[in-house]
Amino acid sequence: MALGIDDFDGLVGTNISGTSDLAPLDEQAGIIKELFPDAKTVGLLYCSAEANSQYQVDTVKASLEELGYTCEYYAFSDSNDLATVCQSAADASDVIYVPTDNTVANNTEIVNNICQPAGVPVVAGEEGIMSGCGVATLSISYYDLGVATGKMAAKILTGESKVEEMPIEYAPQFTKEYNPTIAEALGITIPDDYVAYEG
């Protein structure tokens, strides 16, 4: 998708297949609407060096704008300018969205140390980031994704399937989760259909 393939059907046609950890981006925008219906501005915080993050924030931005939010990009180039950019996002946003971004995943403490004192909730692209700095997520299970990947590999090794005929697979299910510590600190009431992250 980051390569501009609009009609990708999951088949590469060569000796490549596997699984994708792409989250349900439209539905992630939906949980922002569900949890923060009165918010006006959403800051999209991501690393500009990660093409996967750019794709995610572009998609979420389009969905959020359809829901009536004003969105701004807050891109940082690496961990050295994350704090400065995050502070700008916190100063100007009612809510911050962070995709499944590797740089943020490795620096959630920086994000939390800025956003939580500022009273700005972070909705994350997956549970690992949420556990460090987010209030909620609609996340895949990397365990379940690993099981799916293993089953694909088994089919190839046993000769049941040919790799070039196997479409890319996606996570079989997603879970609404919340971080009880951050939710309590920010005074946010979470609906009953969210599962408390116990990491």
Regions found by a protein language model. Give the residues of each.
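An alpha-beta-alpha
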Residues: 18-64, 165-183
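Periplasmic-binding protein-like
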Residues: 42-45, 93-105, 122-125
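Venus flytrap/periplasmic-binding-protein-like
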Residues: 1-8, 111-133
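Hinge/cleft segment of the Venus flytrap/periplasmic-binding protein
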Residues: 155-199
